[in-house]
Regions:
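Conserved Radical SAM active-site core
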Residues: 1-7, 12-87
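Conserved AdoMet/S-adenosylmethionine-binding subsite of the radical SAM
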Residues: 55-176
Length: 176
């Protein structure tokens, strides 16, 4: 996969591992043409648009150009903003810090809830009730609490088999 990381985020997750992406003024602006050229060079046909919070932007032009390359496009979003663009897969990861846009629930292909403490399980269930029946459900331990939360997630998933465990494999392998 090719990851396109867009700068800018006002959600403010305390555990965010890319806080350097929050201030869009700290990063250079790349043209869509440059981004498309870079993607084209990889010959990769799967693109993940992430952030920051990529849904802060109208992504129609970028996704249109990626579709011309016959790319499959995934979006990772907190769901705070309306989703504007053409996506094949939407990973919706709501945060307690900012209420999600109600229209995002019906567009989500995947609901991913970060588990920071025990109360996040009931919060996850509340959000799962609002997404479509085909939406995949994932619980991911917050990295600094991984040792504490992973066993609780495993127990929860055993008792709620509609949920899956999402692990940040790249962190276990020390790959950035």
């Amino acid at each position: 996969a090719v990851f396109i990381r867009l700068a800018g985020c006002d959600v403010g997750c305390i555990w965010c591992d890319v806080k350097e992406s929050w201030d869009k003024n700290e990063h250079s602006v790349e043209s869509i043409e440059k981004i498309i050229s870079d993607v084209k060079e990889t010959n990769c046909k799967f693109v993940v648009i992430t952030g920051g919070e990529p849904a802060m932007y109208d992504l129609t032009n970028l996704t249109t150009e990626l579709k011309l390359l016959e790319c499959e496009i995934a979006l990772e979003t907190s769901g705070v903003y309306p989703i504007i663009g053409n996506f094949d897969w939407i990973c919706f990861s709501p945060k307690k810090f900012k209420k999600p846009n109600e229209n995002v629930f019906g567009k989500a292909d995947e609901l991913k809830v970060i588990v920071f403490n025990k109360s996040d399980f009931s919060w996850a269930q509340e959000h799962a009730a609002k997404v479509g029946k085909e939406c995949k459900l994932y619980l991911q331990p917050e990295w600094s609490k991984e040792k504490e939360m992973t066993p609780l997630i495993i127990d929860f998933v055993k008792n709620n088999p509609n949920w899956n465990i999402s692990l940040q494999t790249h962190k276990y392998l020390d790959i950035r």
